[in-house]
Amino acid sequence: MLEGIVRESIGRKAAKALKRDGYLIANIYGKGLENINAAFKVNEFIKEVRKKTTLIFDVKVGSQTLSVVVVDYQKDSVTAELKHVDLKVAQKGVISKYMVPVKITGTAIGLKNKGVLIQSKRRLKVKCAAENLPNFFELDVSKLDVGDALLVRDIVVPAGVTMIDADRVAVVGVEKAR
């Protein structure tokens, strides 16, 4: 389990000092909950996020243990180091919006016919309770030829999950190479 500290002061000076000591600044929030200003060791946070198998993972901040989902993060444009992360508390029974990653499987027929596979959406926006949250959407592209595309409406959505993205939006397609 990832362990962090509660930040007492939330000013720029305090945040810089924490970053200098190897901490990642984080905000944790949820529906009906008070925001928590926290900090995690950067290396520990990266290890935890890489080894997790679900979108939801547990963190311990101070005396609280919370189940959270990564909502957003900021990276340094030059060094690509993590600067800041926003975490949302995944509360059971509370319907909330999440971003779910898209995994592509198979090799498209169109790639052999001088086509290029283009993934226009890497994450899809859904609305559901935390217990119904899928870890990813898996799309099989093996039947796609040049000019074909898989749309949001082609994705099989589990019970209790509602797609927020428009039905006609292309997720992945094969286009003719130039």
Curated annotation (Swiss-Prot):
A GO biological process held by the record: translation
Residues annotated as signal peptide: none
One matching Pfam family: Ribosomal_L25p
Keywords: Ribonucleoprotein, Ribosomal protein, RNA-binding, rRNA-binding
Annotated Gene Ontology cellular component terms: cytosolic large ribosomal subunit
UniProt keyword Ribosomal protein, yes or no: yes
CDD domains: Ribosomal_L25_TL5_CTC
UniProt cross-references to InterPro entries, sorted A to Z: Rbsml_bL25/Gln-tRNA_synth_N, Ribosomal_bL25/Gln-tRNA_synth, Ribosomal_bL25_b-dom, Ribosomal_bL25_C, Ribosomal_bL25_long, Ribosomal_L25_dom, Ribosomal_uL5_bac-type
Membrane-spanning intervals of the chain: none
Keyword check for RNA-binding: yes
GO-annotated molecular function: 5S rRNA binding; structural constituent of ribosome
Function: This is one of the proteins that binds to the 5S RNA in the ribosome where it forms part of the central protuberance.
Subunit structure of this chain's protein: Part of the 50S ribosomal subunit; part of the 5S rRNA/L5/L18/L25 subcomplex. Contacts the 5S rRNA. Binds to the 5S rRNA independently of L5 and L18.
Record PANTHER family: RIBOSOMAL PROTEIN L25/GLN-TRNA SYNTHETASE, ANTI-CODON-BINDING DOMAIN-CONTAINING PROTEIN (PTHR33284), RIBOSOMAL PROTEIN L25_GLN-TRNA SYNTHETASE, ANTI-CODON-BINDING DOMAIN-CONTAINING PROTEIN (PTHR33284:SF1)
Similarity comment: Belongs to the bacterial ribosomal protein bL25 family. CTC subfamily.
Full protein name: Large ribosomal subunit protein bL25
Gene that produces this protein: rplY
